[in-house]
């Protein structure tokens, strides 16, 4: 079968708009399969389009099985690429730093970012409510990459990730960049 081009892979369908964000609105939207995604023009106007992304990937974690050989391959790759470096993978350690780094990373890669200051502040508030979480990767004490996600009920909703450290640290390469992003 033919693999679609990047722009053909996903379709974002707007289902509604809101004039602001709140924890209640985020939770309600996520439980209905929708999430806010403003562009620069919407953000300047204070509007938040809510939509759905098709196709949507759902991983049933009860069925995920990391085989012994897969765990060994990951461990060996980490040892091979990070030998002599202090590597830490942390959960919920530095949410504010991670989300700010993600926003900056995506701002530099495009003309602006869909992550408005209001959205960043909202996810920080959701983190304080133990709804939003992060995983961060640190190399020699410096943030190397991270991701954040939202937990509502029994579902985890993956958000954005970044690996800004990959371009600057001599020990990082394209292969290790993928490991940082997957953290």
Description of each model-found segment:
Residues 1-183:
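N-acyltransferase acceptor-side catalytic subdomain
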